[in-house]
Amino acid sequence: MELENKLKKVTLGHEEGFGAPCLKCKEKCEGFELHFWRKVCRNCKCGQEEHSILSNNEDDRKVGKLFEDTKYTALIAKLKTDGIPTYKRNVMILTSPVAAKKDVSINTVTYEWAPPVQNQALARRYMELIPKDKQPVAGSEGAQYRKKQLAKQLPAHDQDPSKCHELSPNEVKQMEQFVKKYKNEVLGVGDVKLPKEVEAQACGAGRSTNGSLSTLTTVKGTEDKVAAQKESTYYCFRCKENMREGDPAVYAERAGYDKLWHPSCFVCFTCNELLVDMIYFWKNGKLYCGRHYCDSEKPRCAGCDELIFSNEYTQAEGLNWHLKHFCCFDCDCVLAGEIYVMVNDKPVCKLCYVKNHAVSCQGCHNAIDPEVQRVSYNGFHWHAAPECFICSCCSKCLIGQKFMPIQGMVFCSVDCKKKMSS
């Protein structure tokens, strides 16, 4: 009964972000409208993350659900109204005086997310060490980047069966087991600390850093200088460069005390993007974002973007597809056993290809069927037929012959070219 109730709650959140403008297509898109089962806009075919959707509440609920039943419950709160776990995102507001002609004004900068550390100076320095265009200052390019990465790296349909399209009871059960396993074994949240604090924490826990976290070097100077000086150096696990004295580092508990990262180096092994809000998945000595960890464990449907838990699925063009989702990207007709053409890595049926994507023949001005041979040169196309690929002057068939192309026209000889230009 409980499983049936979960299936009844299935929703793709079609109301969320409805009408939001597309940041990529601009005025060409009429506004966001979620496709029935694809995770794209029905109007422009761009993803939800490409639209200007104000979704802080929904994002916080998504991350809150991710942290539910994990060791990171301190980062969530449950609303009394519905009991849904919500991410207690750390927002940092910095104020600084700005000199004015008559008075001193206060400049306020709000970060939509910041490392949850007590030392604000450490959090501020962390922000300075990541690229400026990725700093999540409210209303900035960096804030938009964070929203986009939340959607990309932590898709709701990778953790919540109710966000998926028509899963069977068995698929729901498999997905729940999969999510429970990664929450227990690989999910983690980075911690921002000074390297010496991590070393002290390791010593307090009675664990060895194997010498890779820090090395102590004694330098002997002359009598008029300091007799002995101790210098502690720490290096980044990713780039192998030293940490600067006093700069914060990112520590990942699942990776162990002997590994630290520069803030800008705490990235996914696959996509190389900053791990959003320092949420990571640790596997085989590598950091992954949620999406790419799941991709390393399960096939993902190229149609609906969901993980595949069914034993039966199809493969085409090097991609995986649910059997019911191997469909035309334009009209959604099922393509099993049908002729299709790949357009921008998306399968399109023959009818839609001819209607929406086919190039026109310079000879007859009709669309060129995908199965018909063609001649292409410098962006111009012709049917490879004696009635189409002909001299623009004398109509001689040019198939298999030398020709002279001039602005979409072709000529069999210099004489014909001169006749047309005179």
Curated annotation (Swiss-Prot):
Which CDD domains is this protein grouped with? LIM1_Testin (cd09413), LIM2_Testin (cd09416), LIM3_Testin (cd09419), PET_testin (cd09829)
UniProt subcellular location: Cytoplasm, Cell cortex; Cell junction, Focal adhesion
Per UniProt, the ranges with Basic and acidic residues bias are 155-165
Q: What is the lineage of its organism?
A: Eukaryota, Metazoa, Chordata, Craniata, Vertebrata
MF terms in GO: zinc ion binding
Q: Does the keyword RNA-binding apply?
A: no
Describe the task this protein carries out. Answer: Scaffold protein that may play a role in cell adhesion, cell spreading and in the reorganization of the actin cytoskeleton. May inhibit cell growth. Regulates cranial neural crest migration. Acts together with prickle1 to control axial elongation.
Query: Which SMART domains does UniProt cross-reference here?
Result: LIM
This one is known as Testin
Respond yes or no to whether keyword Membrane is given for this record: no
User: Which keywords, in A-to-Z order, does the entry hold?
Assistant: Cell junction, Cytoplasm, Developmental protein, LIM domain, Metal-binding, Repeat, Zinc
Give the protein family: Belongs to the prickle / espinas / testin family.
Which residue ranges does the record assign to the PET domain?
A: 92-199
Superkingdom classification of source: Eukaryota
The record's region (Disordered) falls at 135-165
Q: Which PROSITE patterns match?
A: LIM_DOMAIN_1 (PS00478), LIM_DOMAIN_2 (PS50023), PET (PS51303)
Domain note: The N-terminal and the C-terminal halves of the protein can associate with each other, thereby hindering interactions with other proteins.
Listed GO CC annotations: cell cortex; cytoplasm; focal adhesion
Q: Which organism is it from?
A: Xenopus tropicalis
The record's section on InterPro entries has: LIM1_Testin, LIM2_Testin, LIM3_Testin, PET_domain, PET_testin, Pk/Esn/Tes, Znf_LIM
One GO process term, biological-process aspect: neural crest cell migration
Domain (LIM zinc-binding) spans: 234-299, 300-359, 360-422
